[in-house]
Amino acid sequence: MNRRIIALLIAFIMLFGLMTGCASGKQETAAPETAQTESPAAEEAAAEPEQTEEVPAEEEAPAEPETVSFTDSLGRTVELPADITRIAPSGAVATMILAAIAPECMVTINAAPSESRMAFLPANLAALPETGQMYGSKANLNLETLLAADPQVVIDLGDKKGDMTEGLDALQEQIGIPVIFIEADLPHMAEAFRTLGGLLSGKADRGEFLAALVDRTTTMAEENAAKITDDMRVRVMYTTGEDGLGTNAAGSMQAQVLDMVGVENAVVVEDVSNKGGGNIISLEQLYNFDPDVILFSDGSIYDTVADDSAWSQLTAISTGKYYEVPSSPYNWLSGPPSMNMILGVWWLGNLIYPEIYDYDMETMTQELYKTLWGYELSSEEVTALLGNSTLKAAAQ
């Protein structure tokens, strides 16, 4: 009996040991699962590291604003997109300035550049839809084309005119797109480039670069003009039109370059016109003005004027001191008065007062084309541009 009991106890102990060993084996192979199915307290403890990685709401960086308030040169406060990459110019002046700072952002153009102009300008301008002009005698803004291009803002640049505030407000309400004005005549051009650099996405450096060029130009002109005494002052007439009887009189925006470099504008009239064609004068008035130098715009009678009896008696013609204003890609003095005037300041100062504006205009022309339009002028192209002015004067 005792032996049977002892045998049963031994069997029981062996069986218990086997059961314990299986249980241990199962725990080892199932360890990953049991770690995930632990008690609620253990689950919360395991989840705590994920919670601590989350940034509390109050510490998150504020979202970038979608719009910004901008006060334009007319004092109008307009809400603009914070990230501007699609712009439409209001006309020719705006086209020229915007093409210098951000051609890739332009979605329209006032008018397609001619083939000769496109040779110097960014290639994308040729394919842009034409929207016409917002202001002037040729105002013909095409709203349908403008809206189809989907700009974020319409930008008007140039000089202040009449009741612009009312006109821009009305247009903005009509099209549902922000419309702003930035003053950009010669005295305000550097500021205009800096303003555009701040508004347009990624253009701060380019805006400052162009503004620095304007500052350099105006400072140079102011310093040199101050050296010109009254007895040195040259009387200059700047003509327009095929017959040369359109004139940009003293005080006209179209004649800003003449004022800046220190010449005397020979044409003085009571009712000054700021239009591209200027004031129309008669031959009698022309004889009375009798300037020392005459500047002809392209497409005029420049080539034949020396053989024209109506003109040959004038001092400027008889002495050979008449010149043609370079006009590629745009007239360097005006037409329209925009950033092309920067070229005009360097050119006219050197043409009239080479001993004061003392630099190589051929080299300067290449530098300015590179800066403004990214175009590398060849020496042959420089000769073509300056042949009827700087190079002609140097040969006299």
Question: Predicted regions span which residues?
Answer:
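Extracytoplasmic substrate-binding proteins
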Residues: 67-70, 77-79, 166-246, 326-389, ...
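Short helix-initiation/N-cap motifs at beta->coil->alpha
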Residues: 73-75, 131-144, 271-283
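Alpha-helical, coiled-coil/dimerization segments enriched in small aliphatic residues
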Residues: 135, 247-277
